[in-house]
Amino acid sequence: FLPTDIAKQCYNEMSQHQDWMFDSMMGYPEDERDSQVNKWWTPYDTESKNRLEVDMPAVWKSLEYFNSRQFLMFLEKLTGINGLIADVDYEGGGIHRIKNGGRLELHSDYNKHPTQDMWRRINLLLYLTPDWNYNGHLDLCEKEGLVKVKSILPTFNRAVIFNTTDDSIHGHPTPLECPDNISRY
């Protein structure tokens, strides 16, 4: 990671959307980089989680690290939001798969956690598909999706962090144009 003071300065200098992008977020071994996520994918459930832990330990360790106190402290310093708490149940999170033709309408995420009395404050997206070149850019927008602030290519090991507010409109409204045997994660 960047030193926290430099990362925070850059984060604060971004648009009012307040986002930050890290390339090469985590160190993944080459054998986990080569689309292995496709071979074990099923909708997120306990069995999939257990297979992820065994088949892709670096990805699993990343998920654990994102919930660690050390990483939460980094996010607190980066964003200036104190008292962050990990969502260990991945409510609204986890690993998402999007196939050919898929898209995600522009939207803002819920702010209040559906089962706990907590506010959702930050989104972290980490892209896991190598050699991506099939649309599906993450669009960050303002004014209810009318003004695109940024369009981010979902390249492998790129992380995007942004505040979760009613105004943090995001999505990938342009459908993916990938071969049927490839999905975006």
Where are these regions (language model features)?
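Short, well-structured alpha-helical interface segments that form or flank functional binding sites
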Residues: 5, 9, 66, 70, ...
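A structural signal for short, well-ordered beta-strand segments and their strand-loop junctions
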Residues: 1, 22-23, 85-89, 94, ...
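Non-heme Fe(II) oxygenase catalytic core, chiefly the N-lobe of the double-stranded beta-helix
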Residues: 51-118
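Catalytic core of Fe(II)/2-oxoglutarate
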Residues: 96-97, 101-102, 106-122, 127-185
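Proline-centered turn/helix-capping motifs that create local helix->coil transitions or kinks
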Residues: 18-19, 82-85, 130-134
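Charged, low-complexity, helix/coiled-coil-prone segments
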Residues: 2-20, 95-107, 128-130
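Non-heme Fe(II)/2-oxoglutarate
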Residues: 1-78
